Amino acid sequence: MPIGNNKDNDGTTLNISGLTISDKSSSTSSNNNTTTTTTQTSEPYVPPSRRNKMNNSSGSSRDDYPSPSDRDNRDSPFNRDRRDDGYRGGNNFRENNSNNNNNSRDNYKSPSFSRNNNSNGGGSSSGSGGWDNGPREQGPPRGNSYSYSPNNSFSRGGNQGGYGNRGGSGSSFGKPANKNDRYYDRWSNFRDSRNHPEMKREFIDLEEHKAEEIFKKNDDNIGIDFNAYDDDDISIETSEHICAPLNSFADVDLGDVLLGNIKHAKYTKPTPVQKSALPIILKNRDLMACAQTGSGKTAAFLFPIISGILLDGAPEAPPAYKPGVPRAACPRALVLAPTRELAQQIFDEANKFSYGSPVSSVVIYGGAEVFHQINELDRGCDILVATTGRLVDLLMRGRVSLSKIKYLVLDEADRMLDMGFEPQIRQIISEFDMPGCRDRQTLMFSATFPKQIQNLAADFLYNYIFLKVGVVGTTQNITQRIEYVVEEDKNSYLLDYLSGLKSDGLCLIFVETKRSCDTLTYFLNQRNFPTTCIHGDLTQPERENALQSFRSFATPFLVATDIASRGLHIGNVNLVINFDLPTDIHIYVHRIGRTGRAGKKGLAISFFNEKNKPVGAELLKLMKASNQDIPDWFEKMVHNLRMSKGPSNSKSNSPFNKSYNSHHNRDDNRGGYGGGGGGNGGYSNNRNDRREDKSDYSMHHPYFSNNGGSYN
């Protein structure tokens, strides 16, 4: 209790447990070797449990609680935190006091409350919580807000009915915090040596652990001997010769930063598609490139894009901030991909090769949290890698603008059309603010280019060059084998084959349906083959975890549907098994292309039976074109199919047989076999239609005119 001049305290000295207290003066005396201290009692008595608190805090006493009115303000609905729906005042506030870890009630220290009738909303709009270091920014008055500052080191602003952000922080009106300030700062401090020769940078070899972390995260192309591509048998055809192919990356000036990253990634020589595509793209020409899978198409378009962005320098300043109006990201390069996995992979490569530069890359795709992707866009974006659906969504929201696009890339373009994305592609290019084909550079890459893709190129590419490298769609580095296995014996045959497998690489097994994917994965795991799976019903985190487990050899067997057949660069895949053959030969091409990548040898085994007859003829043709060993039984089976006649041997309404009969009518130059009102005779007309389509397309590009309209 406080000690003062009253009836219990008349000014005399009191001795409490050896402590002498007086209200007059301070002195020190010694009696019987005992030291007593006399102190002035101008301050109230403080218990021992509070002394440590007073020494380490600016609080004056235990009784220094906020007034009742302030405590009422603490419970005001305007002081709610939207993140956890709790109150910021009272006991919900937890003080972080590094000098005192005692959690007793005596250690409670109240924040100081103040009412501000001219609130600006306070705080930073970029933070995720409700706290903001430093003073609030001043802005125009809006409503009433309550703020409190424990130890005067924090402040939080909220506004009544205002523009509070997700996470509980208020919005500032006068000078909003800009998330991409660092982005523009990086660009303002960067000078490209091609524009500023005095800024010439020497190649600096990174420390081993840092290079391992940055450039070997995706080790698909690390250590690969690209000399395996230097084969005179590899043909390179272009519709127009404008420059000689490259012999090394140093033949063109890509900039010091990019050339250094290429060395760090141990890219010693360009692959054939890179040799021809790089100079064409650097000449600012549109390109439609067809090259074998795993030949380095991703680097072929990323290198010129990163180099061009660095040469152009800092982007234009964003438009002025308007309250309530979202600020759109304005990328300079857009890469469209058919799947999330391929988009993520391209993004990783873009990050790797733009290391040490201000170039910023962002990836957006469906199945992931859209608010996180919007946050990334707000931090600045030069290269945007996207799937079509999520991009259309953000374009409609006004969070992305295509007005500054200088480079447009369609990767695995035929796959996007196969998946039904053509309307979205046309919408993105034509219905939003993307520059016209004469004002941007458009690049299309894929392993196959059927007629539908050629028409798309004719619509969106301007004065383009067609590039074809090697065997279209497949590679001679892959050994293809075909085995006759009936449906009932597939599991046991697969088990016997894997049991005798001596390879230390990865094995990728393709099936037709999602149910088969789960069933076969369970079957192999039960028999001690570590297996994971990937298909369309899995969430994006589940897909990423499965791919990471496969890449890291934790589960060296991956069962997948065709979602994994396109564009995925997974190193060390030595074996691909077509447990279920596809009905489209182009899908087969991309499936087996997951092995034999970048100069390595690979093996592809396919299980064939009566169910797969419709694709047999195309498969035989493809195997012959790549000089594969063909079993006699397979060749005889396909020959017998060709010799079969009449509607009794085929169902004219079957889509598979339509494709099959159409193929043979073209090869044999035959008419229809009659019957069914001339139903089969219609295939001869399809052949003529196909010729007319070729002739029509030959008007779009001289290459197809000179080659009879064929891209093979």
UniProtKB/Swiss-Prot annotation:
Segments for region (Disordered): 1-183, 644-712
Q: Where is the Helicase ATP-binding domain?
A: 278-467
Residue spans of biased composition, Basic and acidic residues class: 61-87, 687-699
PROSITE patterns listed in its UniProt record = DEAD_ATP_HELICASE, HELICASE_ATP_BIND_1, HELICASE_CTER, Q_MOTIF
The terms describing its cellular component in GO are: cytoplasm; nucleus
| Superkingdom classification of source | Eukaryota
Give every Helicase C-terminal domain span: 477-638
Q: Give the Low complexity compositional bias ranges.
A: 25-42, 90-119, 140-157, 644-662
For this protein, the Enzyme Commission number is 3.6.4.13
Which reaction(s) does the protein catalyse, per the Swiss-Prot or TrEMBL entry?
ATP + H2O = ADP + phosphate + H(+)
Binding residue positions for ATP: 267-274, 291-298
Q: Which residue windows does the record flag with biased composition (Polar residues)?
A: 11-24
The protein's UniProt keywords, in alphabetical order, are: ATP-binding, Cytoplasm, Helicase, Hydrolase, Initiation factor, Nucleotide-binding, Protein biosynthesis, RNA-binding
Q: Which GO terms describe its molecular function?
A: ATP binding; ATP hydrolysis activity; mRNA binding; RNA helicase activity; translation initiation factor activity
- Biased segments, Gly residues type: 120-132, 158-171, 671-682
Family, according to the entry, reads as follows:
Belongs to the DEAD box helicase family. DDX3/DED1 subfamily.
Copy the domain comment.
The Q motif is unique to and characteristic of the DEAD box family of RNA helicases and controls ATP binding and hydrolysis.
Record's protein name:
Probable ATP-dependent RNA helicase ddx3
Q: Which organism is it from?
A: Dictyostelium discoideum
Native organism taxonomy: Eukaryota, Amoebozoa, Evosea, Eumycetozoa, Dictyostelia
What gene name does this entry carry? ddx3
